Amino acid sequence: MKQRKKLWMLAAILAICGIAVFACCMANEDNTSSTTEVAQYIPQAPDYSDATMWVTADGDTDGTGADVFYVVSTWEDDWTTEDGRVCHYADVWNPKHRAHMADLEMKKVAAYMSPGNRFFAPFYRHTTIQAFMTNNEDTVYQRTRLSMEDVCEAFDHFQAQRDKSRPLIIAGFSQGGLAVVELLKYIDDETYSQLAAAYVLGYKVTKADMAASSHIRPAEGETDTGVTICYNTVKDVKYVLPLIAGSDICINPVNWHTDATPATLPDTITITLSPEYHVLVATNYSASEYPPFRGFLNVGDIHSCEPWLYSECLQKNIKERAKEWRRTHGS
Protein backbone atom coordinates (compact mmCIF):
# COMPACT_ATOMS: atom_id res chain seq x y z
CA MET A 1 0.00 0.00 0.00
CA LYS A 2 2.79 2.39 0.92
CA GLN A 3 4.61 1.43 -2.28
CA ARG A 4 1.52 2.24 -4.36
CA LYS A 5 1.13 5.59 -2.58
CA LYS A 6 4.75 6.46 -3.36
CA LEU A 7 4.19 5.62 -7.04
CA TRP A 8 1.15 7.92 -7.19
CA MET A 9 3.12 10.73 -5.56
CA LEU A 10 5.97 10.23 -8.04
CA ALA A 11 3.52 10.30 -10.96
CA ALA A 12 1.98 13.52 -9.64
CA ILE A 13 5.41 15.15 -9.28
CA LEU A 14 6.37 14.13 -12.82
CA ALA A 15 3.07 15.48 -14.17
CA ILE A 16 3.64 18.82 -12.42
CA CYS A 17 7.19 18.95 -13.79
CA GLY A 18 5.89 18.15 -17.26
CA ILE A 19 3.38 20.98 -17.10
CA ALA A 20 6.10 23.35 -15.91
CA VAL A 21 8.42 22.30 -18.73
CA PHE A 22 5.60 22.73 -21.27
CA ALA A 23 4.78 26.19 -19.91
CA CYS A 24 8.44 27.11 -20.05
CA CYS A 25 8.69 25.96 -23.66
CA MET A 26 5.60 27.95 -24.60
CA ALA A 27 7.05 31.02 -22.90
CA ASN A 28 10.25 30.53 -24.85
CA GLU A 29 8.26 30.28 -28.08
CA ASP A 30 6.45 33.50 -27.20
CA ASN A 31 9.77 35.18 -26.46
CA THR A 32 11.14 33.91 -29.76
CA SER A 33 8.15 35.39 -31.59
CA SER A 34 8.63 38.69 -29.80
CA THR A 35 12.32 38.63 -30.64
CA THR A 36 11.48 37.96 -34.29
CA GLU A 37 9.19 41.00 -34.34
CA VAL A 38 11.81 43.20 -32.67
CA ALA A 39 14.50 41.89 -35.04
CA GLN A 40 13.00 43.71 -38.01
CA TYR A 41 15.36 46.23 -39.55
CA ILE A 42 14.48 49.91 -39.93
CA PRO A 43 16.81 51.73 -42.35
CA GLN A 44 18.53 54.97 -41.43
CA ALA A 45 16.29 58.02 -41.80
CA PRO A 46 16.81 60.42 -44.72
CA ASP A 47 18.58 63.75 -44.25
CA TYR A 48 16.69 66.12 -46.51
CA SER A 49 19.35 68.80 -46.25
CA ASP A 50 21.53 66.38 -48.27
CA ALA A 51 21.09 66.82 -52.04
CA THR A 52 21.55 63.06 -52.42
CA MET A 53 18.02 62.65 -51.06
CA TRP A 54 16.39 64.46 -53.99
CA VAL A 55 15.74 64.29 -57.70
CA THR A 56 15.26 67.86 -58.91
CA ALA A 57 14.83 69.60 -62.25
CA ASP A 58 14.39 73.30 -62.97
CA GLY A 59 12.53 73.83 -66.22
CA ASP A 60 11.03 77.20 -65.30
CA THR A 61 13.12 79.48 -67.49
CA ASP A 62 10.88 82.55 -67.16
CA GLY A 63 9.74 82.17 -63.54
CA THR A 64 6.04 81.80 -64.35
CA GLY A 65 5.56 78.11 -63.55
CA ALA A 66 4.78 76.07 -60.46
CA ASP A 67 6.75 74.21 -57.82
CA VAL A 68 5.99 70.50 -58.18
CA PHE A 69 6.46 68.17 -55.19
CA TYR A 70 6.29 64.58 -56.48
CA VAL A 71 6.13 61.38 -54.39
CA VAL A 72 7.40 58.17 -55.99
CA SER A 73 5.55 54.84 -55.80
CA THR A 74 6.71 51.38 -54.62
CA TRP A 75 9.87 49.80 -56.02
CA GLU A 76 11.17 47.44 -53.33
CA ASP A 77 10.35 43.97 -52.04
CA ASP A 78 10.94 42.88 -48.47
CA TRP A 79 14.66 42.25 -48.06
CA THR A 80 16.98 40.79 -45.44
CA THR A 81 20.09 42.28 -43.86
CA GLU A 82 23.35 40.35 -43.59
CA ASP A 83 22.50 39.46 -39.98
CA GLY A 84 19.12 38.04 -40.97
CA ARG A 85 16.76 40.89 -40.09
CA VAL A 86 13.78 41.48 -42.38
CA CYS A 87 13.13 44.99 -43.68
CA HIS A 88 9.77 46.26 -44.94
CA TYR A 89 11.14 49.57 -46.28
CA ALA A 90 13.33 50.99 -49.00
CA ASP A 91 16.76 52.14 -47.81
CA VAL A 92 17.38 55.66 -49.09
CA TRP A 93 21.11 55.29 -48.39
CA ASN A 94 21.33 52.22 -50.63
CA PRO A 95 22.37 53.36 -54.14
CA LYS A 96 20.48 50.48 -55.75
CA HIS A 97 17.24 51.43 -54.02
CA ARG A 98 17.67 55.07 -55.02
CA ALA A 99 18.38 54.01 -58.61
CA HIS A 100 15.14 52.01 -58.73
CA MET A 101 13.14 55.03 -57.60
CA ALA A 102 14.98 57.59 -59.71
CA ASP A 103 15.63 55.78 -62.98
CA LEU A 104 12.38 53.83 -63.21
CA GLU A 105 10.02 56.62 -62.20
CA MET A 106 11.16 59.95 -60.75
CA LYS A 107 13.30 61.07 -63.69
CA LYS A 108 10.69 59.90 -66.19
CA VAL A 109 7.94 61.85 -64.44
CA ALA A 110 10.25 64.88 -64.23
CA ALA A 111 10.63 64.69 -68.01
CA TYR A 112 7.01 65.80 -68.45
CA MET A 113 6.25 67.62 -65.18
CA SER A 114 9.37 69.79 -65.00
CA PRO A 115 9.13 71.70 -68.34
CA GLY A 116 7.96 75.17 -67.33
CA ASN A 117 8.12 74.21 -63.64
CA ARG A 118 10.53 73.44 -60.80
CA PHE A 119 10.39 69.75 -59.91
CA PHE A 120 11.32 68.22 -56.54
CA ALA A 121 11.03 64.52 -55.65
CA PRO A 122 12.39 63.12 -52.37
CA PHE A 123 13.69 59.63 -51.76
CA TYR A 124 11.87 58.17 -48.78
CA ARG A 125 11.65 54.90 -46.90
CA HIS A 126 8.66 53.71 -48.89
CA THR A 127 6.88 50.60 -47.70
CA THR A 128 7.63 47.43 -49.67
CA ILE A 129 5.05 45.84 -51.98
CA GLN A 130 4.39 42.98 -49.54
CA ALA A 131 2.27 45.24 -47.31
CA PHE A 132 -0.08 46.00 -50.19
CA MET A 133 -0.18 42.37 -51.33
CA THR A 134 -1.78 41.45 -47.99
CA ASN A 135 -4.87 43.32 -49.23
CA ASN A 136 -5.32 44.36 -45.61
CA GLU A 137 -6.09 48.00 -44.83
CA ASP A 138 -4.71 47.80 -41.29
CA THR A 139 -1.41 46.30 -42.43
CA VAL A 140 -0.98 48.98 -45.08
CA TYR A 141 -1.86 51.73 -42.61
CA GLN A 142 0.54 50.51 -39.92
CA ARG A 143 3.46 49.84 -42.28
CA THR A 144 3.14 53.14 -44.14
CA ARG A 145 3.25 55.37 -41.05
CA LEU A 146 7.06 55.52 -41.19
CA SER A 147 6.96 56.23 -44.92
CA MET A 148 4.45 59.04 -44.48
CA GLU A 149 6.58 60.60 -41.73
CA ASP A 150 9.48 60.77 -44.19
CA VAL A 151 7.28 62.39 -46.84
CA CYS A 152 5.99 65.01 -44.40
CA GLU A 153 9.53 65.79 -43.27
CA ALA A 154 10.67 66.11 -46.89
CA PHE A 155 7.74 68.39 -47.65
CA ASP A 156 8.54 70.62 -44.67
CA HIS A 157 12.12 70.98 -45.93
CA PHE A 158 10.89 71.72 -49.47
CA GLN A 159 8.31 74.22 -48.23
CA ALA A 160 10.85 76.05 -46.06
CA GLN A 161 13.14 76.58 -49.06
CA ARG A 162 10.71 77.55 -51.81
CA ASP A 163 9.26 80.90 -52.89
CA LYS A 164 5.72 80.79 -51.52
CA SER A 165 4.45 83.33 -54.02
CA ARG A 166 4.61 80.51 -56.58
CA PRO A 167 1.76 78.02 -57.10
CA LEU A 168 2.19 74.63 -55.46
CA ILE A 169 1.54 71.28 -57.15
CA ILE A 170 1.60 68.06 -55.12
CA ALA A 171 1.52 64.78 -57.06
CA GLY A 172 2.21 61.11 -56.49
CA PHE A 173 1.59 57.67 -57.94
CA SER A 174 0.30 54.57 -56.11
CA GLN A 175 1.92 54.63 -52.63
CA GLY A 176 2.94 58.16 -53.63
CA GLY A 177 -0.76 58.89 -54.22
CA LEU A 178 -1.48 57.71 -50.69
CA ALA A 179 1.24 60.11 -49.55
CA VAL A 180 -0.48 62.99 -51.38
CA VAL A 181 -3.70 62.27 -49.46
CA GLU A 182 -1.79 62.18 -46.18
CA LEU A 183 0.04 65.42 -47.03
CA LEU A 184 -3.25 67.20 -47.69
CA LYS A 185 -4.33 66.21 -44.17
CA TYR A 186 -0.97 67.30 -42.77
CA ILE A 187 -0.50 70.78 -44.27
CA ASP A 188 -1.81 73.91 -42.56
CA ASP A 189 -4.31 76.35 -44.06
CA GLU A 190 -1.61 78.80 -45.13
CA THR A 191 0.16 76.10 -47.14
CA TYR A 192 -3.15 74.93 -48.57
CA SER A 193 -3.81 78.46 -49.84
CA GLN A 194 -0.72 78.04 -52.05
CA LEU A 195 -2.03 74.83 -53.64
CA ALA A 196 -2.91 75.00 -57.31
CA ALA A 197 -3.79 71.29 -57.37
CA ALA A 198 -2.99 67.87 -55.94
CA TYR A 199 -2.78 64.80 -58.19
CA VAL A 200 -3.52 61.36 -56.71
CA LEU A 201 -2.52 59.01 -59.53
CA GLY A 202 -3.49 55.37 -59.08
CA TYR A 203 -4.75 55.50 -55.52
CA LYS A 204 -8.05 56.19 -53.80
CA VAL A 205 -9.57 59.20 -52.07
CA THR A 206 -12.38 58.17 -49.74
CA LYS A 207 -15.23 59.93 -47.99
CA ALA A 208 -13.34 59.37 -44.75
CA ASP A 209 -10.31 61.17 -46.21
CA MET A 210 -12.45 64.13 -47.24
CA ALA A 211 -14.16 64.21 -43.85
CA ALA A 212 -10.74 64.27 -42.19
CA SER A 213 -9.56 67.38 -44.03
CA SER A 214 -11.17 70.38 -45.69
CA HIS A 215 -8.04 70.54 -47.87
CA ILE A 216 -9.30 67.59 -49.95
CA ARG A 217 -11.80 68.98 -52.46
CA PRO A 218 -12.55 66.96 -55.61
CA ALA A 219 -11.72 68.63 -58.90
CA GLU A 220 -14.82 69.43 -60.97
CA GLY A 221 -13.23 70.68 -64.16
CA GLU A 222 -10.05 71.60 -66.00
CA THR A 223 -8.97 74.78 -64.23
CA ASP A 224 -10.37 74.85 -60.67
CA THR A 225 -7.64 75.32 -58.06
CA GLY A 226 -7.02 74.06 -54.55
CA VAL A 227 -8.54 70.77 -55.70
CA THR A 228 -7.60 67.10 -55.78
CA ILE A 229 -7.44 65.16 -59.03
CA CYS A 230 -7.88 61.42 -58.53
CA TYR A 231 -8.22 58.55 -61.00
CA ASN A 232 -7.65 54.80 -61.38
CA THR A 233 -7.80 52.91 -64.69
CA VAL A 234 -9.31 49.48 -65.39
CA LYS A 235 -10.39 47.46 -68.43
CA ASP A 236 -13.70 46.69 -66.74
CA VAL A 237 -15.24 47.76 -63.43
CA LYS A 238 -15.13 44.14 -62.23
CA TYR A 239 -11.36 44.55 -61.90
CA VAL A 240 -11.46 47.38 -59.36
CA LEU A 241 -9.07 46.56 -56.49
CA PRO A 242 -10.73 48.18 -53.43
CA LEU A 243 -7.50 48.51 -51.43
CA ILE A 244 -6.02 50.79 -54.08
CA ALA A 245 -8.83 51.95 -56.36
CA GLY A 246 -11.88 51.92 -54.07
CA SER A 247 -12.23 55.68 -54.43
CA ASP A 248 -15.18 57.97 -53.82
CA ILE A 249 -14.01 60.56 -56.34
CA CYS A 250 -12.69 60.48 -59.90
CA ILE A 251 -12.16 62.80 -62.84
CA ASN A 252 -11.31 61.96 -66.44
CA PRO A 253 -7.88 63.51 -67.18
CA VAL A 254 -8.50 63.42 -70.92
CA ASN A 255 -11.60 65.67 -71.03
CA TRP A 256 -11.77 66.77 -67.35
CA HIS A 257 -15.35 65.58 -66.96
CA THR A 258 -16.72 63.90 -63.85
CA ASP A 259 -19.55 62.21 -65.76
CA ALA A 260 -19.53 59.35 -68.27
CA THR A 261 -18.68 61.49 -71.30
CA PRO A 262 -16.09 59.40 -73.19
CA ALA A 263 -12.79 60.88 -74.31
CA THR A 264 -10.31 59.55 -76.84
CA LEU A 265 -6.54 59.76 -76.61
CA PRO A 266 -4.59 60.43 -79.85
CA ASP A 267 -3.92 56.70 -80.33
CA THR A 268 -7.68 55.82 -80.35
CA ILE A 269 -7.78 54.60 -76.74
CA THR A 270 -11.17 55.58 -75.30
CA ILE A 271 -11.39 56.57 -71.64
CA THR A 272 -14.82 56.62 -69.98
CA LEU A 273 -15.46 57.43 -66.34
CA SER A 274 -17.79 55.17 -64.37
CA PRO A 275 -19.74 57.47 -62.00
CA GLU A 276 -20.88 54.40 -60.03
CA TYR A 277 -17.42 52.96 -59.38
CA HIS A 278 -15.38 56.19 -59.62
CA VAL A 279 -12.82 54.67 -61.99
CA LEU A 280 -11.76 55.14 -65.61
CA VAL A 281 -12.59 52.34 -68.05
CA ALA A 282 -10.17 52.05 -70.97
CA THR A 283 -11.29 50.45 -74.24
CA ASN A 284 -9.29 49.72 -77.41
CA TYR A 285 -6.24 49.32 -75.20
CA SER A 286 -4.41 46.02 -74.64
CA ALA A 287 -2.04 47.48 -72.02
CA SER A 288 0.39 44.72 -73.03
CA GLU A 289 3.31 46.90 -71.96
CA TYR A 290 2.15 46.40 -68.37
CA PRO A 291 2.22 42.63 -67.70
CA PRO A 292 0.44 41.19 -64.64
CA PHE A 293 2.43 41.57 -61.43
CA ARG A 294 2.29 38.49 -59.18
CA GLY A 295 -1.42 38.11 -59.77
CA PHE A 296 -1.96 41.31 -57.79
CA LEU A 297 -1.72 44.25 -60.22
CA ASN A 298 -2.34 44.71 -63.95
CA VAL A 299 -4.76 41.78 -63.98
CA GLY A 300 -7.65 43.71 -65.51
CA ASP A 301 -6.83 46.86 -63.67
CA ILE A 302 -4.12 48.86 -65.48
CA HIS A 303 -2.47 50.25 -62.38
CA SER A 304 0.99 50.67 -63.87
CA CYS A 305 -0.24 52.98 -66.63
CA GLU A 306 -1.41 55.85 -64.43
CA PRO A 307 1.56 58.29 -64.63
CA TRP A 308 2.32 57.43 -68.27
CA LEU A 309 -0.89 56.96 -70.28
CA TYR A 310 -2.09 60.48 -69.45
CA SER A 311 1.29 62.22 -69.27
CA GLU A 312 0.51 64.80 -71.97
CA CYS A 313 -2.85 65.57 -70.36
CA LEU A 314 -1.21 66.00 -66.95
CA GLN A 315 1.60 68.17 -68.31
CA LYS A 316 -0.89 70.54 -69.93
CA ASN A 317 -3.22 70.56 -66.92
CA ILE A 318 -0.50 71.41 -64.41
CA LYS A 319 0.27 74.49 -66.50
CA GLU A 320 -3.43 75.41 -66.76
CA ARG A 321 -4.08 75.17 -63.03
CA ALA A 322 -0.85 76.98 -62.15
CA LYS A 323 -1.81 79.76 -64.56
CA GLU A 324 -5.30 80.00 -63.03
CA TRP A 325 -3.84 80.08 -59.51
CA ARG A 326 -1.58 82.99 -60.49
CA ARG A 327 -4.52 84.81 -62.06
CA THR A 328 -6.72 84.49 -58.96
CA HIS A 329 -3.87 85.26 -56.55
CA GLY A 330 -2.53 88.24 -58.50
CA SER A 331 0.86 86.56 -58.87
Positions of predicted regions on the chain:
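Flexible, membrane-associating and regulatory peripheral segments of lipid-active enzymes
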Residues: 2-11, 15, 20-106, 111
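Loop/turn elements at helix/coil->beta-strand transitions in domains of secreted/extracellular proteins
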Residues: 64-66, 115-119, 164-167, 193-197
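Structural recognition of the beta-strand scaffold that forms the well-ordered cores
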Residues: 67-71, 120-123, 169-170, 197-200, ...
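Active-site-proximal beta-strand/loop segments in catalytic clefts of secreted hydrolases
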Residues: 71-74, 123-127, 173-174, 200-204, ...
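Active-site catalytic motif of lipid deacylating hydrolases and related acyltransferases
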Residues: 72-166, 291-305, 311-331
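Short, well-ordered, mixed-charge alpha-helical segments that flank or form enzyme active sites
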Residues: 128-131, 177-178, 205-209
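Surface cap/lid and interfacial helix-loop subdomains adjacent to catalytic sites
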Residues: 147-164, 185-330
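Gly/Ala-rich beta-loop-alpha elbow adjacent to hydrolase catalytic centers
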Residues: 172-176, 180
